């Protein structure tokens, strides 16, 4: 709504989403159901909720889009890479508009246990200093769940339609 876009060219609009864990929680729930109740315990919804491309697919279905549809999985950098990839597609003239972001739901007992075994969690007892994602003094990760999507377009296109521009992407880099 905030974008002010009322019309989209379905073939010139991309959807690029990122995820680190996709539907790992749904898979874990289904496996538990199968293990405890047998075949009837496996959730039918797993086929729709566990696939990593479902967030991007649901956006495309909702807006009747037929342009590029990508799901990237680059761990904690998935949202960053989705937004960067979308910006590059716009800059290259491949698309006019892109929905770009990420979503994750995946705090299973197994995930928490294995992350703890690797010593990945924050070792900061002061809750006001605990979450420092871009700070050189950070001591680990803080798991969470959430989603966010930006709508990107060229600046000249946004200005021409009188859009409120909230920011500009000046560059993007990704490395192994």
Language model region names:
Residues 1-13:
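Conserved active-site "lid/cap" helical segment
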Residues 103-105, 112-120:
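Fold-level recognition of mixed alpha/beta catalytic cores in primary-metabolism enzymes, strongest
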Residues 12, 22-85, 94, 117-142:
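Conserved catalytic cysteine-centered active-site region
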